[in-house]
Amino acid sequence: MALIIQKFGGTSVANIERIKKLVPIIKAEITKNNQVIVVVSAMAGVTNQLVTLCSEVSSLNKISQFAEYDVALSSGEIVTAALLALALQEEEIQAQSLLAWQLPILTNNNHSKALVEFITTDLLEKCLQLKIIPIIAGFQGINKSNRITTFGRGGSDTTAALIAAAMKADRCDIYTDVDGIFTADPRIIPNAKRIKEIDFLEMLELASSGAKVLHPRAVELVMRYKIDMRVLSTFLPNTEGTLITSKDTTPLVKSTYMDMEESAKNIKRSTKINIPDDTSGLTYKLPIELALQNRYNMENCIIRGITSNKNLLKVSVNTITLSFLQVANMITYNNNCIEFMQEIKNNIEYNFITNLTDKNNLQTLLTNCKNNKQIQNFTFDTEIATISLIGYGIKNDCKLLEMILSQLTQDNINVNMMQLSEVKITLLINDKDVEKTISNLYNLFKIS
């Protein structure tokens, strides 16, 4: 018996007819003797309507206003969860809609872009024991002040990934309007091929680069907790879709959710909280103050390591006739590798970071360009280095960047360039500051 999380997006629940068509998809998984937990989005277009309504009555420039904004936006998923539960019940399948406060899904206080700290799974486990299918309203959580929070766009994908991690699910299936991940957008490239299987990191790059099938936050979470994810079509339920997986099944964060889950069970045992055996007990939740006795965070930013590279060359070019792309093409022509590209002044000055070993080659190349009056001047700077912090949840955690910049300001470190992704932040600094920066950031984040 496997535990499958099924998430249905906005187009999959766009109207009553489509909601009814989800019943056989869910039932098919049950007939395989699998347990199922469902996460739903709002019906297509509903969230946009709610955003418009909020903007018509509020400027949304106060924290208190964003708290109410979250309440309004969360209603879309709540309606969908109830409608799908009704559709399943109509077919004699036991189902119950569940909201964030009922589990609870505990978050920080960042309204409209909350990060999840802890999910209490007792209620979900009880539903599964009683063969009741939980239908969870996605996109939302609850903070320690008992206020509704939302996760931002793509939040239902995030809910599904988090529930999969909390429940140690065997797989998380994302149902949408396309039958998998393609080599390019099929609307632009009609002969684009569906990818049968893709690695977590490759999928994270695609999602971060604009592929809208999955939200990068959800991909980062299943990669972090090593949970297989499938992208499937609601409208072509018999297709294979795309499997997002890794051959290594060891969770990348061994001591976060696994440890906090056991701690929560100890809290529950020590406070003698009982879960009733009948279905009326499905309003049970672990008190928030107990769950937060230890500071848990399922989406906490984890820094796994810090690296540096001094083997770099900064090239500054003042052009006369060459465009940005022409200069970049010229530099890469003889196998010179560009790591950073930056336009300083429109069509006038550009900066490139490349390998220090390319200096002599570039000296000859750019001198010829200057003699041919293609560029006005160029300079080299060898006193540069990069510092990279590698981990998880980096782009989602606003406090991370704040902590780094505060530390660098305190240390009088000048940052020339910066790049962020879901799994890495890279800073370009003076090479004389490398050791000091590494030491202080290492201690700041207690990397071990």
UniProtKB/Swiss-Prot annotation:
Signal peptide (residue range): none
Catalysed reactions listed for this entry: L-aspartate + ATP = 4-phospho-L-aspartate + ADP
Listed Pfam families: AA_kinase, ACT_9
EC numbers for this chain: 2.7.2.4
Domain of life per record: Bacteria
RPE1 insert domain ranges (all copies): 250-296
Record keyword Nucleotidyltransferase present: no
Keyword line: Amino-acid biosynthesis, ATP-binding, Diaminopimelate biosynthesis, Kinase, Lysine biosynthesis, Nucleotide-binding, Transferase
InterPro entries from the UniProt entry: AceGlu_kinase-like_sf, ACT-like_dom_sf, ACT_Aspartokinase, AKii-LysC-BS, Asp/Glu/Uridylate_kinase, Asp_kin_monofn, Asp_kinase, Aspartate_kinase_CS
GO annotation, biological process: diaminopimelate biosynthetic process; homoserine biosynthetic process; lysine biosynthetic process via diaminopimelate; threonine biosynthetic process
Molecular functions per Gene Ontology: aspartate kinase activity; ATP binding
Pathway listed: Amino-acid biosynthesis; L-lysine biosynthesis via DAP pathway; (S)-tetrahydrodipicolinate from L-aspartate: step 1/4; Amino-acid biosynthesis; L-methionine biosynthesis via de novo pathway; L-homoserine from L-aspartate: step 1/3; Amino-acid biosynthesis; L-threonine biosynthesis; L-threonine from L-aspartate: step 1/5
CDD domains from the UniProt entry: AAK_AKii-LysC-BS
GO cellular component: cytosol
Similarity comment: Belongs to the aspartokinase family.
PANTHER family per the UniProt record, alphabetical: ASPARTATE KINASE, ASPARTOKINASE
Protein name: Aspartokinase
Taxonomic lineage from the root: Bacteria, Pseudomonadati, Pseudomonadota, Alphaproteobacteria, Rickettsiales
